[in-house]
Amino acid sequence: MSAAGFPSTMTSIAPPAVSGSEAKPVSRTPETYLGSLRGSGPAGTSARPANGAWTLDGRWTIADEYAVPETTGVLTFGFDARDVFLVIEPEAGGGTIEVLVDGKPAADTADVRAGVIAPAESRMYHLVRLAAAGPHVLRLTVKGRLRLFAFTFG
């Protein structure tokens, strides 16, 4: 530093501490595919699946790239992250998803309102935004024909 004209006693300044929505996302859950080609498949029928594991209730079709309920189905997922995203594609007629985190309606995000999402196009949807990462259980009650492709976390 002294070569640049700064005193040799000068030290670097640490960035300010941040928390809440400004904090860097931390995820301990890997990206998870729900289709049969890249996914590991559902992990039984537990109401509290382990981190990264998921279960299905109801009649579902697991296609190569996605999972889709026949009419109404429940997907339960264990995760350890602050943010949860899901790629969704509505089929004809669409549908809605009730989003619960630890048994309570998910807080509003850009896509979720009052714990419900109504996907209108094929894209990645922001389902969950928490104050901090931690172990949680996500429960999605899917009503209608919605293709669920992959979860990502932040």
Describe the residue ranges of each PLM region:
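Non-globular targeting/processing and membrane-anchoring segments
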Residues: 1-154
